[in-house]
């Protein structure tokens, strides 16, 4: 049994304050709840370092949070395939798709085959491609990415995320 008794800030980037502090709590809560202790996923810890640097050093770190959430979901195997839809067809920018946590992304016309209580989100193929490529430069892609990552994370953590509740 390992116990942390004391921690000191060793620097390297500014200590998080204000909203950055809550973002840091959120990031660490996701890591704690979605990964097993001492998981050997070095690229995930690289993503954690990158997002913490962004959160501590940038005024607007929304894109960094979305990028980290997507990296976390992808590396843990909880992200849907954004290269192909449920029919094996390539995701096309001009199409609209239905995304749910439980199923593959499908063209919106096929969404009716799912139980109406099955929560999901309609999203353009262009946004899916931007999410897949980590392109969060457009405000619309940031907003849609938030809906997508929140849907997927909430499905994995039905008990909720405490740090998110503090910010609301």
Functional labels for PLM-detected ranges:
Residues 1-168:
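Non-catalytic alpha-helical scaffolds and adjoining flexible linkers that form interface surfaces
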């Amino acid at each position: 049994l390992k116990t942390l008794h004391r921690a000191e800030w060793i620097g390297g980037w500014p200590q998080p304050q204000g909203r950055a502090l809550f973002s840091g709590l959120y990031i660490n809560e996701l890591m704690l709840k979605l990964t097993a202790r001492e998981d050997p996923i070095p690229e995930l810890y690289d993503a954690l370092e990158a997002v913490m640097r962004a959160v501590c050093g940038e005024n607007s770190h929304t894109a960094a949070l979305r990028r980290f959430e997507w990296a976390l979901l992808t590396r843990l195997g909880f992200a849907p395939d954004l290269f192909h839809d449920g029919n094996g067809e390539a995701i096309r920018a001009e199409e609209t798709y239905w995304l749910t946590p439980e199923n593959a992304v499908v063209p919106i016309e096929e969404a009716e085959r799912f139980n109406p209580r099955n929560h999901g989100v309609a999203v353009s193929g262009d946004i899916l491609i931007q999410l897949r490529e980590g392109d969060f430069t457009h405000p619309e892609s940031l907003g849609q990415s938030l809906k997508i990552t929140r849907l997927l994370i909430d499905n994995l953590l039905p008990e909720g995320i405490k740090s998110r509740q503090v910010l609301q």
